[in-house]
Design a protein with these regions (language model features):
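Active-site segments of SGNH/GDSL-like serine hydrolases
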Residues: 115-123, 141-171
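Bacterial N-terminal signal peptides that target proteins for export
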Residues: 1-10
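Catalytic His-Asp segment of secreted/periplasmic serine-dependent ester chemistry enzymes
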Residues: 158-228
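Charged helix-capping and loop-helix junction motifs
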Residues: 99-100, 130-139
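Second-shell loop/turn segments in exported
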Residues: 51-59, 126-131, 155-159, 203-208
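Boundary at the C-terminal end of the N-terminal hydrophobic targeting segment
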Residues: 22-24
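Conserved SGNH/GDSL esterase-like catalytic core that processes O-acyl groups on lipids
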Residues: 27-32, 40-128
């Protein structure tokens, strides 16, 4: 039943992308994904995670990165070149983060589509000053990655809804000329969590998006690309 449900979601995802409104945007040739464990996490035995893709999809092809890539491939008729990086260290220590040094490979990649999905590992933003500092760091991250090019930038809100973080991400996205993708409603559907699809020994892994949640994230990102 789960396999059938996922296949239905995948068909919907691909058809939605294939019927996106036509825009002047040329097909994306290079796509950069920056995120945390939801974007990519290597095997880690002590938390019972054996994958090397977005946690906690059941397979590489079912995480949001690969679903978005598949959707773009269907629309363009050719697969874009992709780069996927986990920047959880930026979330945890964004102040003074050496963007130019630590993310040199990502900058030199010169992506024409940049998708940023961060925030979940950020400590709580307890004051307006902390929120402003995070916003400033994310704005610097985005502008450095764009490096003066007219890249399309998507900034996704947190999967685990958090108003303070999401507001900072939205403002940073606007400051860098990006598009903010609000997925906060997904957190209210228990079916979007991996724990609803199969058992996990580690509660943290189980709290990540499962196949349904990953498909919903991908659908939101692809829909945002269809908006002028």
């Amino acid at each position: 039943m789960l396999r059938l449900h996922f296949h239905r979601l995948l068909v919907f995802l691909i058809l939605s992308c294939a019927t996106l409104p036509a825009t002047a945007q040329e097909p994306f040739r290079k796509v950069l994904f920056l995120g945390n464990s939801i974007t990519k996490h290597g095997p880690k035995a002590d938390i019972d995670w054996s994958g090397d893709w977005g946690m906690a999809a059941s397979a590489e092809a079912r995480d949001y990165v690969h679903l978005v890539t598949q959707g773009l491939t269907v629309k363009a008729g050719a697969a874009p070149e992709t780069m996927v990086k986990n920047i959880a260290d930026f979330e945890r220590a964004h102040a003074g983060y050496d963007i130019a040094g630590k993310l040199r490979e990502a900058i030199d990649f010169q992506a024409d589509l940049i998708i940023v999905a961060i925030g979940e590992n950020m400590p709580a933003l307890k004051t307006p000053e902390e929120q402003a500092a995070f916003q400033e760091s994310v704005t610097k991250l985005l502008t450095t990655l764009k490096a003066g090019r007219h890249s399309v930038v998507l900034v996704r809100s947190c999967f685990w809804k958090n108003a303070a973080k999401d507001q900072a991400l939205q403002k940073a996205s606007a400051a860098a000329g990006g598009r903010f993708v609000d997925i906060s409603a997904l957190a209210g559907d228990e079916g979007n969590y991996a724990r609803s699809e199969r058992p996990f020994k580690h509660a943290g892994v189980a709290n990540h998006p499962g196949d349904k949640g990953m498909a919903a994230i991908a659908a939101a990102l692809l829909e945002a690309l269809g908006k002028k």
